[in-house]
């Protein structure tokens, strides 16, 4: 175990979605890092910037409780503490409610509710013992409003939001902050393919659904997440914020 005066942050999937951008933001703000399955070249980039980095592989699937446990254990073994932790997980199931099956429901609950449950359970324990810490659960803006074509997904995301709020209420007296941010309409390959927005004409129609008239970038989203996990804002907990250009 190495002793450090720097804050230690965990990014559960540093190879997907906002993970790489979060890692870069945290490194720029003076953190040492624990990264799950980082993107190629990311570790060398962050170490060159001055961060110590612990890598954990094979932990992308947060539906497995051992994934979150391995990440948190790596932080405690390498650095002796864990100051902040962020994770994104999810399983999209689309279609009308009347055509859904119980298997659809179980699938979306596993990806959207059980996964953050396991992550919260693993991360909150050492933070309670430390008497401080920050956890950010990254979900979906569909948790904040009915979502035609994805009712089970929206409901499961709302469940994760309420889980976050309840955990936050339970551990606030221990100095631990727990918040959630939900995204939609992000400029990301998976979203572009799923929405058909790889076609410029379709993209224009998708962007027209966003009050701000465009898609969000990973870099600006990571910057928005900063105060929830970088130690600069210690008086906010139990909150859900939609990050979707005004859609929610």
What are these regions, as identified by a protein language model?
Residues 120, 156, 164:
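Active-site helix of classical SDR
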Residues 140:
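Residue(s) in the substrate-gating loop at a strand-loop-helix junction
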Residues 2-34:
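Canonical Rossmann dinucleotide-binding motif of NAD(H)/NADP(H)-dependent dehydrogenases/reductases
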Residues 96-97, 101-109, 202, 206:
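Substrate-binding pocket helix/loop in short-chain dehydrogenase/reductase
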Residues 125, 169-170, 234:
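Alpha-helical segment proximal to the catalytic Tyr-Lys
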Residues 172, 177, 236-238:
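Short, small/polar-rich loop/turn modules that mediate ligand/substrate recognition or access, typified
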Residues 226, 233, 237-248:
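Short C-terminal tail/terminal secondary-structure segment
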């Amino acid at each position: 175990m190495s002793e450090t005066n720097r804050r230690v942050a965990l990014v559960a999937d540093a190879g997907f979605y906002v993970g790489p951008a979060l890692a870069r933001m945290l490194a720029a703000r003076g953190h040492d890092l624990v990264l799950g399955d980082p993107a190629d070249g990311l570790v060398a980039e962050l170490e060159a910037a001055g961060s110590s980095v612990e890598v954990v592989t094979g932990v992308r699937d947060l539906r497995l409780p051992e994934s979150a446990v391995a990440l948190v254990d790596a932080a405690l073994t390498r650095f002796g503490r864990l100051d902040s932790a962020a994770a994104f997980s999810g399983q999209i199931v689309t279609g009308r409610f009347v055509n859904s099956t119980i298997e659809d429901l179980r699938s979306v609950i596993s990806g959207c509710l059980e996964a953050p449950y396991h992550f919260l359970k693993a991360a909150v324990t050492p933070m309670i013992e430390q008497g401080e810490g920050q956890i950010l659960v990254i979900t979906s803006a569909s948790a904040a409003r009915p979502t035609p074509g994805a009712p089970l997904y929206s409901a499961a995301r709302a469940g994760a939001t309420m889980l976050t709020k309840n955990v936050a209420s339970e551990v606030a007296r221990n100095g631990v902050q727990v918040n959630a941010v939900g995204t939609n309409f992000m400029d990301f390959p998976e979203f572009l393919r799923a929405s058909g927005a790889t076609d410029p004409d379709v993209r224009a129609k998708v962007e027209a659904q966003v009050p701000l008239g465009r898609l969000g970038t990973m870099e600006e989203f990571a910057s928005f997440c900063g105060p929830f996990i970088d130690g600069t804002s210690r008086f906010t907990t139990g909150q859900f914020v939609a990050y979707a250009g005004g859609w929610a």
